[in-house]
């Protein structure tokens, strides 16, 4: 399928990264990021042979004995590792997952728990070579390919907005390329038979693979199974989600990856880019896999609305600056335990009364981003209700 074939209002756009017409490519990216906030990307330069090896390696990981995976369990002191109990919007997801992030040392060859690898998100926890042969090497290789593609896409997004080289917002992209705090999530969705009362509560709504949410970071690169039709994107805003036609299913193109913009891109673009609400459905008979790569800023980065966008020079500033490390810590804490109110970009809107601005200043003063974060230690800051 070529990028100009997707004209249906019920399909997210398809963009060909190999398009030699730079202006056309930028216009396609701009339209996708400002309308859907989602697009499928073809000819993205991640080798298809690597994608296939990564799919096979991922399946081997989740087929390991449960007790082996539990040895890698994440906790309140370490955001990275295996888990099967995540909360999304305060509701438990129907999935198993493993989070792997860029090491604090930026050196994958260092041992996982080497002190140099400490960072806010914690330490990686890989299975041993004996437990899951070649898993580490293949995963790291795929991670680095996603990093390169993310940097390329972020710069294209900036160009689409008319951001010029040398301005503050372009420099943020330079820093992000060097200091990004991205992580790769490996998801496994077991079959979910809603008629099986031993696993599903018949008195509650059918569980979702992942409940409706927006991604917190800058952008996401998602790899799905080619025959998977479970990812759905909200066509409308929250107030309209009660309608049956509120959700549009993403039908994966073989060999493509799916891109979506996140909360930080929305703040950075002053609301020009859309951070879309999306969810994942369960399947009663089929097991499925997916892998989102979350491209995130440095922990110390204050994400603020762009100041040199030729597209909207007179646009009123809509957001206050947002400290990524603070936003990320609160989102992780909310994944792990119910803190009552999940932090959103709406808390940083100029017209919103919120204590998060003061809280993030306090957070930056007391938290060392070169140490793994402890949810319980900083609960007093995290439990802000504003």
PLM regions and their residue ranges:
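Peripheral, non-catalytic segments flanking oxidoreductase cores
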Residues: 1-386
């Amino acid at each position: 399928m070529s990028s100009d074939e997707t004209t249906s209002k019920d399909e997210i756009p398809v963009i060909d990264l190999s398009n030699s017409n730079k202006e056309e490519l930028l216009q396609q990216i701009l339209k996708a990021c400002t309308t859907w906030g989602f697009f499928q990307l073809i000819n993205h330069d991640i080798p298809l042979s690597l994608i296939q090896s990564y799919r096979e390696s991922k399946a081997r990981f989740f087929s390991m004995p449960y007790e082996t995976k539990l040895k890698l369990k994440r906790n309140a002191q370490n955001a990275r590792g295996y888990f099967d109990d995540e909360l999304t919007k305060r509701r438990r997801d129907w999935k198993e997952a493993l989070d792997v992030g860029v090491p604090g040392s930026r050196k994958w060859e260092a041992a996982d728990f080497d002190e140099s690898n400490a960072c806010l998100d914690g330490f990686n926890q890989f299975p041993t070579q004996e437990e899951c042969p070649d898993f580490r090497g293949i995963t790291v290789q795929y991670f680095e390919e996603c990093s390169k593609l993310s940097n390329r896409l972020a710069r294209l997004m900036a160009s689409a907005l008319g951001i010029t080289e040398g301005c503050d917002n372009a420099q943020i992209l330079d820093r992000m390329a060097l200091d990004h705090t991205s992580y790769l999530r490996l998801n496994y969705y077991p079959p979910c038979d809603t008629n099986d009362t031993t696993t599903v509560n018949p008195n509650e709504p059918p569980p979702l693979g992942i409940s409706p949410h927006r991604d917190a970071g800058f952008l996401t690169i998602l790899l799905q199974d080619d025959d998977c039709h479970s990812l759905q994107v909200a066509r409308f805003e929250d107030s309209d989600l009660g309608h049956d036609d509120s959700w549009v299913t993403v039908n994966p193109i073989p060999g493509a990856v799916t891109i979506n913009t996140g909360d930080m891109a929305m703040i950075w673009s002053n609301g020009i880019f859309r951070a879309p609400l999306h969810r994942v459905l369960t399947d009663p008979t089929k097991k499925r896999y997916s892998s989102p790569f979350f491209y995130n800023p440095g922990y110390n980065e204050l994400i603020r609305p762009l100041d040199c966008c030729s597209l909207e020079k007179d646009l009123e500033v809509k957001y206050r600056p947002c400290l990524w490390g603070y936003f990320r810590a609160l989102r992780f804490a909310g994944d792990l335990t119910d803190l009552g109110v999940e932090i959103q970009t709406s808390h940083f809107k100029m017209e919103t009364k919120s204590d998060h601005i003061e809280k993030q200043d306090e957070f930056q003063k007391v938290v060392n981003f070169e140490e793994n974060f402890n949810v319980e230690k900083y609960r007093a800051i995290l439990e802000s209700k504003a």
